[in-house]
């Protein structure tokens, strides 16, 4: 007897992927086995080894780890955030080995696209979900290049990677990375702060001062002082260096003839 050929609509595959987070090939096979019945395909998946992945795919993943890897020549580096649901799994060696494999692969293959990286590890992620019983998410990563890269990771919760040029040493780059981890600047220099951000903050501080009953001239002076503090909070070079609070980061960079060209800072679960 001739075997019946079943044509599966691509929209049906997309819907099954959306509802299960399973790969295209597996979804197509499941739909063929279920004669195109979406709900039956899901039921069959849940009965199979993909059951846990289907069940867990919508869970929030706010735990996990931050990892950083830099090439031996210190000129190319990657920082990544991979999430799970609990600290228990985050500390599990299997989860940590998965994270290590992901970042090393991204580094060696010079992957720049998060979608490519997620697809590359789709099967391994699904298997890990089934093994540890929690959803796993390769959430984000950043690539930095430069004359000299440094990094720092604090307890797998905060990660920093910095690109610099000049008379750079590994120890100094680590200390600058530690400073960024602790102080969380948003920009390198005052000139990097968008004009609309400065105008908005200045207007807010001026309004606050004027509403307190101060004259316009005094309000301007108060606003100038508050804007100075504002820049100290968000601009790296204006901050006091945590290793020597008697000097600013800007003074440190001048002293050692160093220029910070770029940096990135990840904090686990931020903006989720």
From Swiss-Prot:
CDD domains registered for this protein in UniProt: UBA_EF-Ts
PROSITE patterns named in the record: EF_TS_1, EF_TS_2
Subcellular compartments: Cytoplasm
Pfam family, one: EF_TS
Keyword Cytoplasm: yes
InterPro entries: EF-Ts_dimer_sf, Transl_elong_EFTs/EF1B, Transl_elong_EFTs/EF1B_dimer, Transl_elong_Ts_CS, UBA-like_sf
Any one of the GO CC terms: cytoplasm
Region annotation (Involved in Mg(2+) ion dislocation from EF-Tu) ranges: 86-89
Keywords, comma-separated and alphabetical: Cytoplasm, Elongation factor, Protein biosynthesis
GO molecular function, a single term: translation elongation factor activity
Gene3D superfamilies: 1.10.286.20, DNA helicase RuvA subunit, C-terminal domain, Elongation factor Ts, dimerisation domain
Similarity-based family: Belongs to the EF-Ts family.
Protein role: Associates with the EF-Tu.GDP complex and induces the exchange of GDP to GTP. It remains bound to the aminoacyl-tRNA.EF-Tu.GTP complex up to the GTP hydrolysis stage on the ribosome.
Protein name: Elongation factor Ts
Organism: Blochmanniella pennsylvanica (strain BPEN)
Gene name linked to the record: tsf
